[in-house]
């Protein structure tokens, strides 16, 4: 895992100063009140994660990084996995959510808990505490909910929330189920305040209305002013949210998006994004980030910033060993170090996934000529072109130069008994699979 340092090691006077410099705070309650809370004795804070999919994604990663910064500063984290709210789903910008079966949501909740536990400290003097709002919500009957919780919410305030107002004015409208979500989330904050004296909730900027519901509820029924802050929503180059409901999710679960593809996602970010991404997604000291940003401007071809970003984020999420394998796989594919035989099957399969022809790998067998296999892989238009390129020394079989135009595939050429990599020159790579 990437090395996590506290705000002093990173070059800041306080954790709040660090979070603001990194661009990790979008909106907050009164800044002085928030600073007083974070700069004093350790407080308890929480962030909620609804199990609406089998994995968290990089939009959630921003919140986990915020939690880790606060944890490193000595504050006590609570990770709420929404066993109750996950059955409902918070209102989206457009369209009603599909309600998932209870057993599916419970299974997803277990997976999310495991993911979060792999990122936050779960042992030592300041471990993360896991809670599920199902534990205090499921037993509450409708009458008690309306009398004890619902009476503290005003319709005017609820209707004014951005997402609610937008949905009300849309063609789809909004159901009472999704409209009630903010009441459940507000009650969560109150419960955690009463149970653990939790005085800070964090979330994405699209959650501001839900966060302030709990803020207002605690002020009304307990007479205490607590704090909330949100982080900016991460978007792609087209300004679209990197979220699971948008169809371009970058999952944190290695079985849903391999560590290799996760690494490549970060490595392929453009120079224009380096400053924001290095600040938000790494724990590197301020001075080192500033050096990398300057380096990306003066020597962009070196891609040191991208390489550092990809290493830091991938090792933070997937661990150092999986990250090393991803790096070695990328180098080995094009003969730039590393041995193809050392790449495990799942990493290799992820690395070559984008090299399919018409959605699949061309099928070959031992005894087929390399020239024919190269043509099937889409590297050549004809057998004669393949032979000519072999003759000039420009064809490689699993990174070994092919010397004979009539060379055939051998059983030992198939990596993991399945794949053969054929390269034309330095950059054109094709893959065939054993039939």
UniProtKB/Swiss-Prot annotation:
Residues in the signal sequence: none
Which parts of the sequence bind L-tyrosine? 46, 181, 185
Q: Residue ranges of the S4 RNA-binding domain?
A: 368-425
Q: Where is this motif: 'HIGH' region?
A: 51-60
Keywords in alphabetical order, please.
Aminoacyl-tRNA synthetase, ATP-binding, Cytoplasm, Ligase, Nucleotide-binding, Protein biosynthesis, RNA-binding
InterPro entries attached to this UniProt entry: aa-tRNA-synth_I_CS, aa-tRNA-synth_Ic, Rossmann-like_a/b/a_fold, S4_RNA-bd, S4_RNA-bd_sf, SYY-like_C, Tyr-tRNA-ligase, Tyr-tRNA-ligase_bac-type
Give the motif span ('KMSKS' region): 241-245
| Residues where ATP binds | 244
The record's subcellular locations are: Cytoplasm
- Gene Ontology biological process terms in this record: tyrosyl-tRNA aminoacylation
Supply one GO CC term from the record.
cytosol
Question: Which reaction(s) are listed as its catalytic activity?
Answer: tRNA(Tyr) + L-tyrosine + ATP = L-tyrosyl-tRNA(Tyr) + AMP + diphosphate + H(+)
Any one Gene Ontology MF annotation carried by this entry is: ATP binding
Alphabetized PROSITE patterns for the sequence: AA_TRNA_LIGASE_I, S4
Return the EC number.
6.1.1.1
Q: Which HAMAP family match?
A: Tyr_tRNA_synth_type1
Subunit structure as annotated in this protein's UniProt entry: Homodimer.
Q: What does this protein do?
A: Catalyzes the attachment of tyrosine to tRNA(Tyr) in a two-step reaction: tyrosine is first activated by ATP to form Tyr-AMP and then transferred to the acceptor end of tRNA(Tyr).
Report the family membership. Belongs to the class-I aminoacyl-tRNA synthetase family. TyrS type 1 subfamily.
- NCBIfam families, per this entry? tyrS (TIGR00234)
By what name is this protein known? Tyrosine--tRNA ligase
Q: List the source organism.
A: Bifidobacterium adolescentis (strain ATCC 15703 / DSM 20083 / NCTC 11814 / E194a)
What is the gene called? tyrS
